[in-house]
Amino acid sequence: MGTRGPYALVDTTPAKTILVYRNGDQFYVGRKFVFSRRRVANFEALLEQLTEQVEVPFGVRRLYTPTRGHPVLGLDALQTGGKYVAAGRERFKKLDYIHIVPRKPSKMRKLKEIKPVVHCDIKVPSRWQIQSRTSRYINVFTNGRLFIPPIKVIIPKFSLSDWNSVLAMIGEKVFPLGGVRKLFTMDGHLLDDSKNLQDNYFYVAAGLETFKSIPYWKSSWVPSEVQQRFGGNDKYTQTKKRVESKVKEPLQNDSVPPRSQDSVYYAKEKKQMDTELLVQSGAEGDVYKAQTPAKEAQEALEVKEDPEVKVEVPVDQAPAEIVKEIDEIGDSSPGLKSGMHIPASFM
């Protein structure tokens, strides 16, 4: 029969549990570590396992007591349930490690429920709304252009105090001739202040030209309640009748249709000139004679001409004289009968 070898002696030392802190960290709560002689043969093996469990720069190389900082040199110096400080090659940093208490997680604040913004679609005049409204929303037509849709313009609160800035903001989106110089209501009332502006209302922007009376409220972009409000506008109906009456008058007087009158190939009739004299004639029928004599000549007497005064008249204007012939002169003169000598110049 064979003989049995001697039994190997087994270390029956119980395992030890220690709490390890990190050197110089006042917020590190500490970590429990359990080791036995079977797994940890010496002090170097313990330091290697602590390096894996406690994150220390450059690894755990020393253990200190938490109160006075005495170094631990072997496994026998460790006590069950003891507290120690793991450090690298630096010196012990004195802190109150024993009274480090784990912090309770802070309570999460309940976030307020974000409610969606509810936009109000009620269209009422601005004087009924809250004064803290930051802006005005208006719709603007272009003067004389009914078929162009109205432009929505947002006017901030700080711009409402200056009327010129309001017109300038409208002019950035609406482009009448000459820029926006005037703002009218749809029935032609001129606005000169932003206090009269109403939210979600319709206006007409114009330049230097006059307001063109067109039924803007009949546009398809205008709500039905606004169309009903302007449906019986007396001002527009009166102007429409006035324009129609002016168009009918020339058609009744002229037998030629208006298209032929406007045509360049149509020969228009000459107008008869007035036969009345523009200048009235005087008492004697002379248009150049003054009706009343001048003041200087009213008391002057007219001087009559003297009959004995001889006036030299040109030969061509002198009255013609009858010249008698020589025979008649000889018969009538007594000298010729008695044999008087007649000069040779008369022969």
UniProtKB/Swiss-Prot annotation:
This protein's UniProt keywords: Cell projection, Cilium, Cytoplasm, Flagellum, Repeat
GO CC aspect terms: cytoplasm; sperm flagellum
The keyword tRNA-binding is assigned to this record: no
GO biological process, alphabetically ordered: intracellular signal transduction
Region named Disordered: 235-260
Cellular location(s): Cell projection, Cilium, Flagellum; Cytoplasm
Xref: Pfam families: DCX
Compositional bias per record (Basic and acidic residues), positions renumbered to this chain: 241-251
Domain Doublecortin: start-end pairs: 16-98, 136-217
PANTHER family the record matches: DOUBLECORTIN DOMAIN CONTAINING 2, DOUBLECORTIN DOMAIN-CONTAINING PROTEIN 2C
Protein name: Doublecortin domain-containing protein 2C
Underlying gene: Dcdc2c
